[in-house]
């Protein structure tokens, strides 16, 4: 008679499985041998699977080129090719287009000519500034200022300024006649002037009541006030000189 089983013996026992992963089965792959080291024992399949190396491809390409054909050397052509020089171009400023509003210059004197059209395009403040430089009045509207400048410009071309007169006097040389004049005057009655005397050598004119003071000079029968040349003659000869409009009337 069988012995009774203890409690818990009738239950199946648990079997612990190992966590190690099974190793995959690897097949041995035969490496193809190169063409140079293949022997007669090697199979034909292994020989067909051999691929040429890059060195062998280059060697085969060189053998295919005929000897008579000239192959240009890249190194020589690259060495002989000149390197283009970089040239920087200078930037030239754009030329200003000549407009009709540009300042007009007198061909004879080289001075600016005042144009009425050009003045009318200027502002009142600019016109007043131009009037100030010419010692003109700055009162009035734009038309009055333009007219004033035009009139002043016309007078300036007829009557030279003081600076121009002084410059001409400095450059004027003394005539040879004045350098040879004696210090002694030979006064004779002035033709057409009963109350005046004149010296033929210098052309100086004196009053009959004061023959020591020159008041003008005579030229082509007309009496004029003393100019810079005749004043210089008076200084060199030690003659007093004076000029008043009352003497010449």
Swiss-Prot record:
| Sequence segments annotated as region (Disordered) | 1-110
Give me the stretches of Basic and acidic residues compositional bias: 1-12, 22-38, 95-107
Any Pfam family matching the protein: SAP
Q: Which PROSITE patterns match?
A: SAP (PS50800)
Q: Boundaries of each SAP domain copy?
A: 119-153
Entry superkingdom = Viruses
Q: InterPro entries attached here?
A: SAP_dom, SAP_dom_sf
What protein is this chain from? Putative SAP domain-containing protein 049L
